[in-house]
Amino acid sequence: MPAAGSEPSRPPSPPGVQEQSAEPRPPPPPHGELQYLGQIEHILRCGFRRDDRTGTGTLSVFGMQARYNLRDEFPLLTTKRVFWKGVLEELLWFIKGSTNAKELSSKGVKIWDANGSRDFLDGLGFSDRAEGDLGPVYGFQWRHFGAEYKDMDSEYSGQGVDQLQKVIDTIKTNPNDRRIILCAWNPKDLPLMALPPCHALCQFYVVNGELSCQLYQRSGDMGLGVPFNIASYALLTYMIAHITDLKPGDFVHTLGDAHIYLNHIEPLKTQALMELRGQSSRSLDGDGQAGTSRWAPVATDTERDRCCELQREPRPFPKLKILRKVETIDDFQAEDFQIEGYNPNPTIKMEMAV
């Protein structure tokens, strides 16, 4: 018997068996892509039917936000293959200040071809503009905000405000500034643009040696555009962090009109969720106003919770490596970037609404 007041000795734990911790290890954070898939599901369930500029028709909600971690991963979506070369080449084209769609097309990236076509430009009243000349779109606003736009071949060096360089300089000299903003929305130039900016404004934020970015996107095509935009602004954050000796932090994506084109509904069901089993896939209830209608699945909330399951599980996000030390934003080349571990689900074909 042990002496009064003494504690009986316990035999040592067998090898390999550890004492149970008083504080269990927290579960890993959910996959970042689930935010995007949740947005798709929410629009399919709750979106309003709205007409749009292209005549295609959309399901739309107003106001959404997601936050993507950039520290050890790169948010290139995995539930479908995202056109990484297109993301990279388009961003380099923006940084160059180019407004020539043919320049991008010559690199095999044809995402601006339709908006720069002869028919499209003529339809906007730009019949005197050369084919491929998009007007003062993103790159021009980033590098020459306020300059007078003539055409895609004119020289604009030293004209207007180089917002992108000003962002970089401010991050280096005054990282606590709350005005580190890059804006593509220029009301004076909107009538000259083949397409007004969808991703209109981004703000950068520095804390604890990390650079984060928040994008305000006035119009988000959830099927085609948004996966591209997530990767593009994540890449821009990596690039600016690299040349300012910071580490990437978060990318915060704020959407205004977040919409699914009606001809993208079935492809996105393949990507995001399964149809409600035994139910009509959709029903418009007619309660909308001014030509709008609410998207209303027939199933109850309980049935939706049971029946809506992920059709494609997200896979681990890849990593992005910058292969050499680059000193200025204009020195980046496509060969400087390497995506590692990208193993997405197959491509899902969707037609672009023009």
UniProtKB/Swiss-Prot annotation:
GO terms for cellular component: cytoplasm; cytosol; mitochondrial inner membrane; mitochondrial matrix; mitochondrion; nucleus. There is a cross-link at residue 349 (Glycyl lysine isopeptide (Lys-Gly) (interchain with G-Cter in SUMO2)). GO terms for molecular function: thymidylate synthase activity. GO terms for biological process: dTMP biosynthetic process; dTTP biosynthetic process; methylation. The modification Phosphoserine is found at residue 117. (6R)-5,10-methylene-5,6,7,8-tetrahydrofolate binds at residues 221, 353. DUMP binds at residues 53, 178-179, 218-221, 229, 259-261. It is found in: Nucleus; Cytoplasm; Mitochondrion; Mitochondrion matrix. Keywords: Cytoplasm, Isopeptide bond, Membrane, Methyltransferase, Mitochondrion, Mitochondrion inner membrane, Nucleotide biosynthesis, Nucleus, Phosphoprotein, Transferase, Ubl conjugation. Pfam families: Thymidylat_synt. Pathway: Pyrimidine metabolism; dTTP biosynthesis. PROSITE patterns: THYMIDYLATE_SYNTHASE (PS00091). NCBIfam families: thym_sym (TIGR03284). Belongs to the thymidylate synthase family. Catalyzes the reductive methylation of 2'-deoxyuridine 5'-monophosphate (dUMP) to thymidine 5'-monophosphate (dTMP), using the cosubstrate, 5,10- methylenetetrahydrofolate (CH2H4folate) as a 1-carbon donor and reductant and contributes to the de novo mitochondrial thymidylate biosynthesis pathway. Homodimer. This is Thymidylate synthase. It comes from Bos taurus. The gene is TYMS.
